[in-house]
Amino acid sequence: MADKKVVGVIKLQIQAGAANPAPPVGPALGQHGVNIMEFCKAYNAATESQKGNVIPVEISVYEDRSFTFVLKTPPVVELIKKAARISKGSPTPHNLKVAQITPEQVKSIAEAKMVDLNANDIDAASKIVRGTARSMGVTVA
């Protein structure tokens, strides 16, 4: 496995358990020569328990057209939308506030995202989550 050469890394955000060969998955994998259906089946099996979430995936493609993938945690935006029970953020976040979340919800989102965030402790991760919420028009109170 160590002597395989990586020829490409593809980053996608796909609905859990709902990967199919249609865009954006098909074209992104097709240009690297990956078996699209094989990836879709593997991804759907790996994300079966997380249906309803958008799960980022990082796919490493090797020179023999084989691949491996790593699943990440759902994006902060998706977690905030779920916590606030909204479908999208505010079109004008500084003027129009669309929802409110509690500091406890911010902390739980920060704990869930800690492995993927560039933060040293939970307070720094909470600040990142608060900033994302602010740019979506969601207040923390």
From Swiss-Prot:
PANTHER family: 60S RIBOSOMAL PROTEIN L12, LARGE RIBOSOMAL SUBUNIT PROTEIN UL11M. One of its GO terms (biological process) is translation. One of its GO terms (molecular function) is large ribosomal subunit rRNA binding. It holds the Pfam family Ribosomal_L11. Keywords: Methylation, Ribonucleoprotein, Ribosomal protein, RNA-binding, rRNA-binding. It comes from the Bacteria. It comes from Tropheryma whipplei (strain Twist). This is Large ribosomal subunit protein uL11. Forms part of the ribosomal stalk which helps the ribosome interact with GTP-bound translation factors. The lineage of its organism: Bacteria, Bacillati, Actinomycetota, Actinomycetes, Micrococcales. InterPro entries: Ribosomal_uL11 (IPR000911), Ribosomal_uL11_bac-typ (IPR006519), Ribosomal_uL11_C (IPR020783), Ribosomal_uL11_C_sf (IPR036769), Ribosomal_uL11_N (IPR020784), Ribosomal_uL11_N_sf (IPR036796). Disulfide bonds: none annotated. Gene3D superfamilies: Ribosomal protein L11, C-terminal domain, Ribosomal protein L11/L12, N-terminal domain. One or more lysine residues are methylated. Part of the ribosomal stalk of the 50S ribosomal subunit. Interacts with L10 and the large rRNA to form the base of the stalk. L10 forms an elongated spine to which L12 dimers bind in a sequential fashion forming a multimeric L10(L12)X complex. Belongs to the universal ribosomal protein uL11 family. GO terms for cellular component: cytosolic large ribosomal subunit. NCBIfam families: L11_bact.
